[in-house]
């Protein structure tokens, strides 16, 4: 079977083979001849058809890389790529070039007056200057007021008992006194010894009594019985003046003083006294005003640095009570208390209690309660004066309580003096004041040794006050005392003498002049209480008394005490109630749009960026598709919703404190525990804005949502405020976050062109300068541009007296007028002296006017000083005057940057005159003025007694107010020091108050929200703590001038300061319009500069001192002023023609270049004065010009130093000379004569020479003329409180002051209980005049009373008829002894002007006058004959150093020197810097001197100064971020107080990631260390300029290798460099930032504007080809930096 299958298969095969092989055979056997049988077995067939492709094979192994192909052709420019995301912010570029100066800004409005600055540090005492020359004697000043009484002299030795009977020297006759009132008859004296009989005379009528003689000697010690009181005699006529007789004192005769006579009738009232002291303050003080409206929103303050939030401290324990404070100032007068109960009636012992007539006005009781305020009544006419009441002595009433001190009452009209009956006699009073010496008595012959005592004359008026005597010398010691029991035993009182006969009445004499107050007499025994007199006028306020006894009357309010000394610090207070919210800040600017953020890996914490400002919320968009996107930004605060329903009542709170009476808020209690969280109520009303939280940290980026972002929707409208969320639990205390880094400091900018700042506070008064020269009268110039606000000018001259004006009420300020101010008119005729006006009420403060045109009028001629008139009262404010003269130049200010001039502003109104300033120092004597018109003849009055207070001035009913209503809110106070920056809150509507929670700890800061809507201005918050001084801001606008403050207490004069050193000359300031300054000292001669144009001819100056005789030059006459021409366009400079009329200022042309000096032109005539041009901006300070050419003249003989003459007008620079070679110095010639002025030269270039050296101190000048009285200066700042002085003597009454402000209302005291009888109170207020009383019965004749004091001066009596002639008296012998010098007489009238005197003798030659104008160039003279040899001159100044001479010939060979020392003694110092924190080792062969820190360079005042790193100066032994300070010429140094820098080599220490500045100890790892080494030989650095290390020269050894460091710059593109031969140019390590910048505020950091410069590699083949630009990145930096090696010469 198997075999069958095989054969069958073979058969099938053969069949197929046969079928297939037929065509093959045919093909194989092709070519066989037909009929022949071909054998085709085994022949290869033809190529078959291509098969189907096979399956893909497996990839083969990678082949080897082929060779690099050639570079392909440059491809086409590709399409623009899609815009990439914004790159990071680039580093700050270098500062750009300074821009062109901007156009001048308009002048700003005047700024507010700044608050007085703090008191400066007292300067050092200056060195004592040399004694100056004595000045000329000044004119006598006005007579000053009498000085205070001197210190009592030392007690003299006891006087000797002189038993001599010789009379003293006779005094000069005094002035006759006025007639006195006849006194009562004196007691009859003892009969004298019988004199020799006189010649019989006829009996004459009794003569009038004589004037009182000098005090008689003591009477004999006999006492008689007291006689009855005599009737008052009629007034006797004045007696004729007698002559002083020589009186011999009886030996051992003692006189007893008699009883005092009866008091005289009360005289008529005296003349009104001087104006009394200022009355009490006006109306009652109103109640406290309501809270003022909140002020406008202020400008945003500067950002302060964020402080780290501190944890609130616990309240401290109460401290110990402080020391008692100083006495407080006297408080304001309290309200008058209620009336007390009547006092007890204490009957007088020994007398019955009979009710007498109504007594005088009792002491004022306690005031009643305050009534309602009535309307002010119309002032009634003064009532008629009532007659004096009867003086029946009633029993004294009970003493009342001491009343408060009453206010000063109005002075009543003088009463009609109806004399009453005489009262009862009082006890003898105290001895009166000692009267002046009387006139001389009649002569008595010397034979009459004892004179009878005549009847006493009437008391004389007080005499004139004598001059202040000098303190007497200590007297001689007295003889031994015979009666030494104390002060002597008084003898018994003598009997009163018999009453004398009444004299006939004399005629009334003329009234005498009022006498001066006499000296105080000795204190007598205290008399009994006299009859109560009529109420006297109120006295002057007394000085402050000693503290009185404490009266324990309840309810009495004491006066406010003096200001106490500051007490010790009190206990720390408990926390106060929270303050009110501050004002919201301004909204910040809009921030930059952010990029599309894709979620990245969380990176390292970045530097804290500045917080971005939130953008506005966009409008609502359509709903996007896809999953929700990230949380959107917070929208703008929506409109407040309607109030919700009241919430569910919360849990019951802790019981509140029961307050029975509304009091002040109590101390806050301890915080309660947290209650359970209640259910959230419905939303309440929006609450007040809370304090802002601390910004939270930025959250993690959220996971990005899946889905395509939708298109941004439109901005939605503000949503309605949602309900508040549930309250969270209190968070834990957060960790203290790191403080953010300060920003990079910007480069120091160019000086800004700022507007002038507001005027500073008034400077200290300067020293009195010398008088400047008198200027010419100029023509009025066009209005100049307004200059800077000047310092307060010196007081202007006193104006003429205006016409008598009626005092009108102050009108409202008028609107400012518009118009150019014309030149001042001629002075008006002086008007009559005005009547005293009322004190005007200060007007409302006017708005500040815009600045006016500063047109300067021509200066007037100096007037003659008039005779000083009596000071008039203060008149009403006059109309604004014309602008005064410009003030004298102030001291030079600090050097300021030049501001641009602004266009003139419109004129503003004049301000209100300020108060009187502190009197200035007495000026030097002025020159003799022209004689003024004769003034009215005034009589010199002696100093009068302080008069009684005058009647009150007329009161305007509009001004006299009763108690005012509650006042308006006060002006805002002085702004406090700006506090720390507050956060900006969102103002909301006020909500219902919540319960006070426990203060939470600061939570984590959230993301910054959008700016809220601006809230209402909050109430003014409490002043913050004083912040650190911020950067100087731009000058603010000048504020409104505040009301004048109260005058400060004058401080004690300070000790004189040391004179400062002379400062450098500043840049020229803007040419202001002012008086010429004081002439400066003569400087050293500078190089001859280019001459300027000739100036204006000056008017005739004051006569100078005689100069050396010269040939007078031709002086041109001043021409008449021409008419101004129209402004011309700037044309090319023509030939100098004759001077034309001054044209109006033309348009400014372009600045031309400096021309070459032209040849001197012919001398022209002096032109008319041109008009003042507008001052241009100051040019840049030029380089010093080339020395002018010209042959120097021979130096003159040195003159003696004369007195400084009056300053001449400024000289005009002369024409330029031709350039000539420098001549040899000639012999000293004599001074040349003054030549005529030269012609105007071409203008020189506007270059400014260099600063000259300070000249020597010039001799003092002559005293200038006395200036006029200046206007009062501004009120100075209030001085420091002085120490409490000792209690002074009672001063004279002051001038009436203006009505004071109403005081604060005091509390009403409760009525007091009835107290014990008090001591007598103060005098009560003057009562209304009573009705005339009925005359009483005549009283019984009482015992003899003591004589009353002299009544007031009576009215002048009529001149009586002359009496009959008296009989001739006995002829006496005149013994004339010269008396003492009498008091000075009344000054006589000024005499007539005397005739001119004869010419005086020839005066001494005057000092050399000022140099004259330069003369025109003369023709060259012929050679003169050789003069004789002069005397040897004074030694000249040392000459400048000469040029080096040629080398001299070779010297002879010297002897061999001594053996040399070891070469190591000649060490060379080098410095090696490690650039690490470890100090380096000194190289082999050198010795270390010291270690230190590597200082690279410093920068101060924008200028850098570098150190050579190879020298020891670059290795400071101590490190400081500010190792230097700066000093100025004023002996003041400042340290770490400016924007200065220091730069130090640094280490490879990496900066922290935050890049915040390094402070404190964290700076140390960044500062490189260094070592100073001593090498035995010279050390140099060699540089290869390749990357190979160079070899040391032959014979030199290597010390170290490094990189070639060349230069470095940083802030402000300042820096320094290294000498390439110095070892400092070869740093051992290369770093792109090899140094670090440190500042005076104690920080260091790396900054992007710091660059280091390294020597680069140079290929030999590229030495002279263009360098190819190349940028090297990190890693390749060292491939282009040259290498170097430091080598030391072998020794």
Curated annotation (Swiss-Prot):
Q: What is its main location?
A: secreted
Q: Where is this region: Nonhelical region (NC2)?
A: 27-41
Biological processes, Gene Ontology terms: cell adhesion
Show the GO MF annotations: extracellular matrix structural constituent conferring tensile strength
Give the keywords, sorted: Alport syndrome, Basement membrane, Cell adhesion, Collagen, Disulfide bond, Extracellular matrix, Glycoprotein, Hydroxylation, Repeat, Secreted, Signal
Q: Which residues are glycosylated?
A: 125
Keyword field contains Glycoprotein: yes
Q: Which residues form the signal peptide?
A: 1-26
Disulfide cross-links: 1482-1573, 1515-1570, 1527-1533, 1592-1687, 1626-1684, 1638-1644
Q: State where composition is biased (Low complexity).
A: 52-61, 133-142, 413-433, 786-797, 882-901, 983-999, 1007-1028, 1103-1120, 1224-1233, 1301-1311
Q: Provide the family line.
A: Belongs to the type IV collagen family.
Q: What is this protein called?
A: Collagen alpha-5(IV) chain
User: Origin organism of this chain?
Assistant: Canis lupus familiaris
The opening ranks of the lineage are: Eukaryota, Metazoa, Chordata, Craniata, Vertebrata
């Amino acid at each position: 079977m198997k075999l069958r299958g095989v054969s069958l298969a073979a058969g099938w095969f053969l069949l197929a083979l046969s079928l297939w092989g037929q065509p093959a055979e045919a093909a194989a056997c092709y070519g066989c001849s037909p009929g022949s049988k071909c054998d085709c077995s085994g022949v290869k067939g033809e190529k078959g058809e291509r098969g189907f492709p096979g399956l893909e094979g497996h990839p083969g192994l990678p082949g080897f890389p082929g060779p690099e192909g050639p570079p392909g052709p440059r491809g086409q420019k590709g399409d623009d790529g899609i815009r990439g995301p914004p790159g990071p912010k680039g580093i700050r570029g270098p500062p750009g070039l300074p821009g062109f100066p901007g156009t001048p800004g308009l002048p700003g409005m005047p700024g507010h007056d700044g608050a007085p600055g703090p008191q400066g540090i007292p300067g050092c005492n200056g060195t004592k200057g040399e004694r100056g020359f004595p000045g000329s004697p000044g004119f006598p000043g006005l007579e000053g007021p009498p000085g205070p009484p001197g210190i009592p002299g030392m007690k003299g030795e006891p006087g000797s008992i002189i038993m001599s009977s010789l009379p003293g020297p006779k005094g000069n006759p005094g002035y006759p006194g006025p007639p006195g009132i006849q006194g009562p008859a004196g007691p009859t004296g003892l009969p004298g010894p019988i004199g020799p009989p006189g010649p019989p005379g006829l009996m004459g009528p009794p003569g009038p009594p004589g004037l009182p003689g000098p005090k008689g000697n003591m009477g004999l010690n006999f006492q008689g019985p007291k006689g009855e009181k005599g009737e008052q005699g009629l007034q006797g006529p004045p007696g004729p003046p007698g002559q002083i007789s020589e009186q011999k004192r009886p030996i051992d005769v003692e006189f007893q003083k008699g009883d005092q006579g009866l008091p005289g009738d009360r005289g008529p009232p005296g003349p009104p006294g001087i104006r009394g002291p200022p009355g009490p303050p006006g109306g009652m003080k109103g109640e406290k005003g309501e809270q003022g409206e909140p002020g406008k929103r202020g400008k945003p303050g500067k950002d302060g640095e964020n402080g780290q939030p501190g944890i609130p401290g616990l309240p401290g324990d109460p401290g110990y009570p402080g020391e008692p404070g100083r006495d407080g100032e006297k408080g304001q007068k309290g309200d008058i208390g209620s009336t007390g109960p009547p006092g007890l009636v204490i009957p007088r012992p020994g007398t019955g209690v009979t009710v007498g007539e109504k007594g005088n006005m009792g002491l004022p009781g306690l005031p009643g309660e305050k009534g309602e305020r009535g309307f002010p009544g119309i002032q009634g006419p003064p009532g008629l004066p009532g007659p004096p009441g009867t003086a029946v002595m009633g029993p004294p009433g009970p003493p009342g309580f001491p009343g408060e001190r009453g206010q000063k009452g109005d002075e009543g009209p003088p009463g009609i003096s109806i004399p009453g009956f005489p009262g009862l006699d009082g006890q003898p009073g105290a001895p009166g004041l000692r009267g002046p010496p009387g006139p001389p008595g009649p002569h008595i012959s010397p034979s009459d040794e004892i004179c009878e005592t005549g009847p006493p004359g009437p008391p004389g008026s007080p005499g004139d006050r004598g001059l202040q005597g000098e303190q007497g010398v200590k007297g001689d010691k007295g003889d031994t005392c015979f009666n030494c029991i104390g002060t002597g035993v008084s003898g018994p009182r003598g009997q009163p003498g018999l009453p004398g006969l009444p004299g006939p009445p004399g005629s009334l004499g003329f009234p005498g002049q009022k006498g001066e107050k006499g000296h105080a007499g000795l204190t007598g025994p205290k008399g009994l209480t006299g009859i109560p007199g009529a109420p006297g006028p109120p006295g002057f306020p007394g000085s402050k008394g000693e503290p009185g006894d404490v009266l324990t009357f309840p309810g009495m309010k004491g006066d406010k005490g003096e200001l106490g000394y500051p007490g010790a610090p009190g206990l720390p207070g408990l926390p106060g109630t929270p303050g009110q919210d501050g004002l919201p800040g301004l909204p910040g600017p809009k921030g930059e749009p952010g990029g599309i953020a894709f979620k990245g890996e969380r990176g390292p914490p970045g530097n804290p960026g500045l917080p971005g400002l939130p953008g506005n919320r966009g409008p609502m968009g359509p709903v996007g598709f896809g999953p929700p996107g990230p949380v959107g930004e917070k929208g703008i605060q929506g409109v407040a919703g309607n109030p919700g329903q009241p919430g569910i009542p919360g849990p019951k709170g802790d019981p509140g404190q029961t307050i029975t009476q509304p009091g002040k808020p109590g101390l806050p209690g301890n915080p309660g525990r947290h209650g359970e969280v209640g259910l959230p109520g419905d939303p309440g009303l929006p609450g007040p804005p809370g304090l802002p939280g601390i910004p939270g940290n930025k959250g993690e980026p959220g996971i990005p949502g899946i889905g395509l972002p939708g298109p941004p929707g439109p901005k939605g409208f503000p949503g309605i405020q949602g309900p508040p969320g549930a309250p969270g639990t209190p968070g834990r205390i957060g960790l203290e976050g790191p403080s953010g880094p300060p920003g990079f400091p910007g480069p120091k900018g160019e000086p800004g062109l700022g507007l002038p700042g507001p005027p500073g506070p008034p400077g200290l008064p300067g020293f009195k300068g010398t008088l400047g020269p008198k200027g010419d009268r100029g023509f009025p110039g066009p209005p100049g541009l307004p200059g800077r606000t000047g310092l307060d000018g010196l007081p202007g001259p006193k104006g003429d007296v205006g016409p008598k004006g009626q005092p009108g009420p102050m009108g409202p300020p008028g609107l400012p007028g518009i118009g150019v101010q014309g030149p001042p008119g001629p002075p008006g005729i002086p008007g009559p002296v005005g009547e005293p006006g009322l004190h005007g009420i200060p007007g409302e403060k006017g708005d500040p006017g815009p600045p006016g045109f500063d047109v300067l009028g021509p200066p007037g001629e100096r007037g003659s000083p008039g005779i000083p008139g009596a000071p008039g009262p203060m008149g009403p404010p006059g109309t604004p005057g014309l602008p005064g003269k410009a003030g004298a130049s102030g001291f030079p200010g600090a050097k300021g940057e030049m501001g641009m001039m602004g266009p003139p502003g419109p004129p503003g109104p004049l301000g209100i005159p300020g108060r009187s300033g502190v009197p200035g120092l007495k000026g030097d004597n002025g020159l003799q003025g022209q004689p003024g018109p004769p003034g009215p003849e005034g009589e010199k009055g002696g100093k009068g007694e302080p008069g009684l207070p005058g009647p009150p001035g007329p009161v305007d009913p509009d001004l006299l107010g009763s108690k005012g209503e509650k006042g308006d809110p006060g002006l805002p106070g002085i702004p406090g020091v700006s506090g720390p920056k507050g956060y900006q809150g969102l103002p909301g509507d006020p909500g219902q108050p919540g319960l006070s929670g426990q203060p939470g700890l600061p939570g984590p800061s959230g993301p910054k929200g959008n700016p809220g809507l601006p809230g209402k201005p909050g109430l003014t918050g409490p002043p913050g703590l004083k912040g650190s001084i911020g950067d100087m801001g731009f000058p603010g606008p000048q504020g409104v001038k505040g009301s004048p403050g109260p005058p400060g207490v004058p401080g004690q004069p300070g000790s004189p300061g040391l004179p400062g050193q002379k400062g450098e000359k500043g840049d020229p300031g803007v040419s202001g319009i002012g008086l010429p300054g004081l002439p400066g000292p003569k400087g050293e001669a500078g190089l001859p500069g280019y001459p300027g144009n000739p100036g204006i001819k000056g008017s005739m100056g004051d006569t100078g001192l005689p100069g050396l005789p010269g040939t007078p030059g031709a002086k041109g006459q001043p021409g008449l002023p021409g008419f101004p021409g129209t402004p011309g366009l700037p044309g090319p400079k023509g030939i100098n023609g004759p001077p034309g009329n001054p044209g109006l200022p033309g348009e400014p042309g372009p600045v031309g270049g400096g021309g070459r000096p032209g040849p001197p032109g012919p001398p022209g005539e002096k032109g008319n004065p041109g008009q003042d041009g507008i001052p241009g901006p100051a040019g840049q300070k030029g380089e010093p010009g080339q020395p002018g050419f010209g042959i120097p003249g021979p130096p003159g003989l040195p003159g003696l130093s004369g007195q400084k003459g009056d300053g001449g007008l400024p000289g005009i620079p002369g024409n330029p000379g031709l350039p000539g070679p420098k001549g040899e110095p000639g012999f000293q010639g004599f001074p040349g004569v003054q030549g005529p002025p030269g012609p105007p030269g071409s203008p020189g270039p506007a270059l400014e020479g260099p600063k000259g050296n300070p000249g020597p101190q010039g001799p003092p000048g002559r005293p200038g003329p006395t200036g006029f009285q200046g206007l009062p200066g501004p009120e100075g700042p209030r001085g420091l409180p002085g120490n409490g002085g000792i209690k002074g003597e009672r001063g004279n009454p002051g001038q009436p002051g203006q009505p004071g402000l109403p005081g604060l209302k005091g509390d009403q005291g409760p009525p007091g209980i009835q107290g014990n009888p008090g001591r007598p109170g103060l005098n009560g207020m003057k009562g209304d005049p009573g009705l005339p009383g009925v005359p009483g019965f005549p009283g019984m004749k009482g015992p003899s009373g003591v004589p009353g004091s002299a009544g007031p001066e009576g009215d002048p009596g009529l001149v009586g008829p002359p009496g009959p002639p008296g009989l001739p008296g006995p002829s006496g012998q005149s013994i004339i002894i010269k008396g003492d010098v009498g008091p000075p007489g009344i000054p006589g009238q000024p005499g007539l002007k005397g005739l001119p005197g004869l010419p005086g003798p020839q005066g001494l030659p005057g000092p050399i006058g000022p140099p004259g104008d330069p003369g025109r160039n003369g023709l060259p003279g012929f050679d003169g004959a050789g003069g004789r040899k002069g005397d040897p001159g004074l030694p000249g100044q040392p000459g400048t150093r000469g040029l080096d001479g040629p080398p001299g010939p070779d010297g002879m060979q010297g002897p061999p020197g001594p053996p040399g020392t070891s070469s190591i003694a000649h060490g060379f110092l080098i410095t090696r810097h490690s650039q690490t924190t470890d100090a380096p080792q000194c190289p082999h062969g050198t010795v270390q001197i010291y270690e230190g820190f590597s200082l690279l360079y410093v920068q101060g005042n924008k200028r850098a100064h570098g150190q050579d790193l190879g020298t020891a100066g670059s290795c400071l032994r101590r490190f400081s971020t500010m190792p230097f300070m700066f000093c100025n010429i004023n002996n003041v140094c400042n340290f770490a107080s400016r924007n200065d820098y220091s730069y130090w080599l640094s280490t490879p220490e990496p900066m922290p990631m935050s890049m915040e500045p390094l402070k404190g100890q964290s700076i140390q790892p960044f500062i490189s260390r260094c070592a100073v080494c001593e090498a035995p030989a010279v050390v140099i650095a060699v540089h290869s300029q390749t990357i190979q290390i160079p070899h040391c020269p032959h014979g030199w050894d290597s010390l170290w290798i490094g990189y070639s460091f060349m230069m470095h710059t940083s802030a402000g593109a300042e820096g320094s460099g290294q000498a390439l031969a110095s070892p400092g140019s070869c740093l051992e390590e290369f770093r792109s930032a090899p140094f670090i910048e440190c500042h005076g505020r104690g920080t260091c950091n790396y900054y992007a504007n710091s660059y280091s410069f390294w020597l680069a590699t140079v290929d030999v083949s590229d030495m002279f080809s263009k360098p190819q630009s190349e940028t090297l990145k990190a890693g390749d930096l060292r491939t282009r930096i040259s290498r170097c090696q430091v080598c030391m010469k072998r020794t």
